[in-house]
A protein has these predicted regions:
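Short, surface-exposed patches at the edges or C-terminal ends of soluble domains, predominantly
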Residues: 1-300
Length: 300
């Protein structure tokens, strides 16, 4: 066997093994659907049959009853702000779950007065395990009527400038915003109750705000009534046609970026027209190779 042929086979084997490793190696990055560890959203994605969106421009222009979940860890571009607002105004629902404040740029653009405070919300009395896991137990009548008694946050924040008519849930009066982040309440720090969830009508659609993104991660989704609360938000306007998750604004590792590219390639290759094209190309290459071999053998 020629050296070039051996080298070619080795290259093919290396590529195949690399692609298999990328495909099957589990993700450990937060908010990744194939991450089964504590910070992934594997359970949430399966429960609500979530479809990932890797670009805001890919959002449907006529969303109908579609629901988009956004966990912004990066700033939105001006074009993305326009597209997100159009998604809501055309009838879609956006549930923005944020504790870092990156979602405030959209709130400002959309003319919504509320803001994510971006200061840690602690509760030394009403909590799960410790003050960093505030237990939310004060809700509107509709939410309470749906059987929700308590929701657990994980290093969340609060919402500012929310009118009473827009509020959905509040922290306890023992909660406080830990401005200096020393873990204790100080005289100059604000005490609760604070609004932690709110809802706004925008055009034909709805914008819901939750000041913590952790209720959908694997480790927290099963605590108290977190799953019921997320289910209430998703279905409050009726059963959605699709539940979408904005994957374009969460932090991705090189492995996750490669997984996404590989999944996109697989999706393209699974298209019937693409398969016909590939089969035709392979047939032409094999025919040409056999023909060339025949000429070489005949010439010798």
């Amino acid at each position: 066997m020629k050296t070039s042929r051996i080298a070619g086979l080795v290259i093919i084997l290396v590529v195949f093994v690399s692609l298999a490793a990328i495909w099957f190696y589990p993700s450990v990055q937060a908010f990744m659907a194939n991450n089964t560890m504590w910070n992934g959203i594997n359970k949430f994605s399966k429960e609500f049959n979530v479809q990932n969106v890797d670009s805001i421009s890919a959002l449907p222009t006529t969303p109908g009853q579609d629901v988009l979940i956004a966990v912004p860890y990066e700033q939105y571009s001006p074009t993305e702000l326009i597209q997100m607002k159009q998604f809501i105004e055309n009838g879609g629902k956006l549930i923005m779950m944020d504790d870092f404040g990156y979602g405030n740029s959209f709130l400002e653009y959309a003319g919504i007065p509320a803001r994510f405070d971006n200061t840690p919300l602690l509760d030394p009395l009403f909590n799960y395990k410790n003050e960093n896991f505030p237990r939310i137990m004060d809700f509107t009548a509709n939410i309470t009527g749906s059987g929700i008694k308590g929701v657990v946050f994980n290093h969340g924040t609060a919402l500012r400038d929310v009118a009473q008519s827009q509020a959905l849930a509040w922290s306890s009066n023992m909660s406080f915003l830990d401005t200096n982040q020393n873990g204790n309440w100080d005289q100059d720090e604000s005490k609760g109750p604070f609004v932690v969830a709110a809802s706004y009508n925008l055009g034909k659609g709805t914008l819901d705000l939750v000041s913590d993104s952790s209720p959908i991660i694997n480790a927290v989704a099963g605590n108290n009534d977190n799953k019921l609360f997320v289910n209430y938000l998703i279905n409050s306007n009726g059963t959605p046609d699709k539940v979408l998750f904005d994957r374009s604004h969460v932090t991705k590792s090189p492995l996750d970026a490669s997984k996404i590219q590989l999944a996109n390639a697989r999706r393209v290759l699974s298209n019937p027209y693409t398969l016909v094209g590939i089969i035709t190309l392979v047939f032409v290459i094999i025919t040409w190779y056999v023909y060339r071999r025949g000429l070489l053998i005949g010439g010798s």
